[in-house]
């Protein structure tokens, strides 16, 4: 399944001889935005949904079929998924409203909460290999003070091209939780600067 990862993808640098737990693969998606981790998990899920799938492509497709069925059950109205990693493939699309709903549901998961709020980690794979991962969300890293937001506790970056960046952020301000997002930022860092503006707006006008 690793050979299905699109060109110029962000990676967790997983190799075919590595062995990782499901939790480590989730961390590999959340910190370095590893598209390779997403495909490994998708293929594993597809093997459960379709045990007789003859190829990795068929396994991933079985996962995507289940993914789209689940999307409908949770009320996504403007989304259709043709890849497990958010890559810019034909007919793979969503809306900010749908992504916000996904983010709200995802943040109920303990593993997602744990790793989406982790600036970096040194990971020892199940196979014993060691990897250093850094979170692509600079708003949670105090060592990037220009973008750091103390109230932020997640969630996920994304990009479609070198001039189309996305972000879903989660913050807690005086006991209240908020999720917000940006699609179509022209510069990678704009999403972090706009997040600081959004959080300041929340603190000024919403949380009093």
Could you describe each region identified by the protein language model?
Residues 1-2, 91:
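Conserved catalytic or metal-liganding residues and their short signature motifs at active sites
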Residues 2-45, 130-145, 152:
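Conserved catalytic neighborhood of penicillin-recognizing serine enzymes
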Residues 43-208:
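Penicillin-recognizing serine hydrolase domain
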């Amino acid at each position: 399944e690793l050979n299905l990862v699109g060109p110029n993808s962000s990676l967790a640098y997983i190799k075919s001889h590595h062995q990782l737990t499901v939790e480590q693969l989730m961390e590999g998606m959340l910190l370095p935005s590893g598209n390779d981790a997403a495909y490994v998990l998708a293929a594993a899920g597809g093997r459960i949904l379709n045990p007789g799938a003859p190829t990795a492509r068929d396994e991933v497709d079985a996962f995507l079929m289940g993914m789209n069925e689940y999307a409908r059950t949770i009320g996504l109205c403007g989304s259709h998924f043709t890849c497990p990693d958010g890559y810019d493939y034909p007919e793979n699309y969503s809306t900010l409203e749908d992504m916000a709903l996904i983010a709200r549901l995802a943040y109920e998961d303990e593993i997602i909460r744990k790793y989406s709020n982790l600036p970096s980690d040194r990971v020892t794979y199940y196979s014993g290999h060691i990897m250093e991962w850094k979170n692509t969300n600079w708003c949670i890293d105090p060592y990037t003070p220009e973008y750091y937001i103390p109230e932020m506790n997640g969630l996920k970056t994304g990009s479609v091209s070198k001039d189309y960046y996305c972000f879903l952020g989660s913050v807690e301000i005086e006991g209240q939780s908020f999720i917000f997002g940006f699609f179509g930022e022209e510069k990678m860092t704009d999403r972090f600067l706009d997040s600081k503006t959004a959080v300041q707006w929340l603190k000024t006008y919403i949380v009093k």
